[in-house]
Design a protein with these regions (language model features):
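Metal-associated gating/positioning segment near the N- to mid-region
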Residues: 50-117
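Alpha-helix-loop-beta-strand connector modules within alpha/beta enzyme cores
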Residues: 104-121, 169-180, 346, 350
Length: 470
């Protein structure tokens, strides 16, 4: 086999999993991390990371890639290219495709399409119930054997407590995480957050209690099963939900030792998305449909509670909930348009704006929430989420000082539904390395001794669709 080598030099390497934060080099050989330390005479390709952060490849455990069935919005290829443009080397795709991702064949299809694109690694999250209808459990065992890394009915929560109880038990048997879309639909289902503004706009409101009730129920179900299944609350938005998770985790820490668990490795976790950290329901005031999402944007008090939840460790994972829709769909009236926005490409800089620059978290915490913690959540921690020797050679290089403007028309994604268009952000991807190969490097002058790579998101999308991203 022909040896491939890439040395990333002169950067500040931060690997939260191993407690490394140092100016040093890293050598990648044949798709694996081979060496960390100063290299005087590098062999093969060299990337000059001067002034940059060198981090484990970012992992997004919550994206929607729409294939099969809704390819006009996104495909696995364009979504994986969008991930690379945003610095993500691994993504986990949700099962609300058409048909739902609820069979072994569907799981295998995702891997096949991702391999063909040659961009980010894509791992499927299988549907917990057949057709995501919340009634009958799917064939979790077969999907897990085929490579599904978790289960969810995302887009809806499992309404029946009995069915959810079964889902948790079967997830425990497969050793996979259960991810819950926390919404009691009998209370939810509105167009935006319930409050004075929804009443003023004449839009059906969606109260916080719809989210809080399901979180409370699920934590009780989990504890009743002695936390046998790893439970994860998706895209959290409410102050009440954060407090419920905080209390549940504190109770788990007391229960853990007697149950044989490590109190530091929580069996209850949650995630937040960038839009819920930076936007409020006030954005809906002009009926801009790019502010309609599920769960909805909440109040500033809720945003502050989410940020506190990140600061105190209640929230362990950051995930984009990348949800593409066509321009035609988003051109309908606010009440009719589908929920969701795209987020993979601006996410890193948005998290920096919300959490890093204000001092809520350190670089180490931010990167742990974007890599190591996600890897552990979906069981990929042996080879991903860190830069230990022998780990997969997935690396994200970040230029913390670069200021850029969000331009949705330059995205790799097929869709353009993003409320951050025109925002000026500080911090950008300098390179995305997948399996030891530089897939994206906006400043080509930093890379020497290698074949030309994509320098634009559009170039990434083209390569992915042509199958030339390898």
């Amino acid at each position: 086999m022909r040896k491939t080598s890439l040395t990333i030099q002169n950067g500040r390497l931060i690997d939260p999993a191993h407690g490394i934060d140092a100016e040093t080099d890293i050598v990648l050989e044949n798709g694996k991390v081979a060496f960390i330390g100063k290299v005087s005479k590098p062999a093969g390709a060299v990337f000059n990371a001067a002034g940059c952060i060198v981090a484990p490849g970012l992992i997004d455990t919550h994206v929607h890639l729409r294939e099969p069935g809704q390819e006009a919005k996104e495909t696995i290829a364009t979504g994986a290219a969008s991930a690379v443009a945003g610095g993500f080397t691994t993504v986990c795709c949700m099962p609300n495709t058409r048909p739902a991702l609820d069979t072994q064949a569907q799981v295998e299809f995702v891997f096949k399409q991702a391999a063909k694109a040659g961009m980010a690694h894509v791992y499927p999250i299988g549907a917990a119930t057949k057709g995501r209808d919340g009634k009958e459990l799917s064939e979790m065992g077969l999907m897990a054997a085929a490579g599904a890394v978790g289960f969810s009915d995302d887009g809806t929560g499992i309404a029946s407590a009995a069915v959810c109880d079964q889902a948790l038990r079967y997830c425990a048997m497969t050793g996979k995480v259960y991810m819950q879309h926390c919404e009691d639909h009998t209370l939810g289902g509105g167009a935006m957050n319930a409050g004075p503004l929804s009443a003023k706009l004449g839009l059906k409101g969606w109260p916080n209690i719809a989210e809080d009730l399901m979180i409370a129920r699920d934590i009780m179900l989990s504890r009743n099963q002695n936390y046998a299944c790893r439970y994860h609350a998706q895209h959290m938005t409410t102050a009440g939900g954060i407090e419920l998770l905080r209390q549940g985790r504190a109770r788990y820490a007391k229960d853990a030792a007697a149950l044989g668990f490590d109190p530091a490795e929580h069996r209850l976790s949650g995630e937040v998305s960038p839009h819920h950290l930076l936007l409020t329901d006030a954005g809906c005031g002009a009926y801009d449909t790019n502010y309609k999402m599920n769960p909805p944007l909440r109040t500033q008090a809720d945003v502050s509670a989410l940020i506190t939840g990140v600061a105190d460790g209640t929230i362990e994972v950051l995930a984009t909930d990348h949800a593409p829709h066509t321009a035609e769909e988003k051109a309908q009236s606010f009440a009719q348009v589908p929920f969701g926005i795209i987020g993979l490409e601006p996410a890193l800089a948005l998290y920096m704006k919300a959490l890093l620059w204000p001092g809520v978290v350190s670089w180490g915490r931010l990167l742990a929430m974007l890599s190591w913690n996600g890897a552990k959540l979906v069981g990929l921690q042996d080879t991903k989420g860190h830069l230990g020797v022998g780990a997969d050679a997935d690396v994200t290089v970040i230029d913390p000082d670069r200021i850029w403007q969000v331009d949705v028309n330059a995205f790799a994604s097929r869709s353009r539904n993003c409320p951050f268009h025109g925002w000026s952000l500080k911090g950008a991807v300098a390179a995305t390395v997948v399996s030891g190969k530089v897939k994206y490097a906006p400043d080509a002058g930093r890379l020497t001794g290698a074949s030309p790579v994509a320098t634009t998101a559009a170039g990434l999308a083209q390569a992915a669709q042509n199958g030339s991203g390898h």
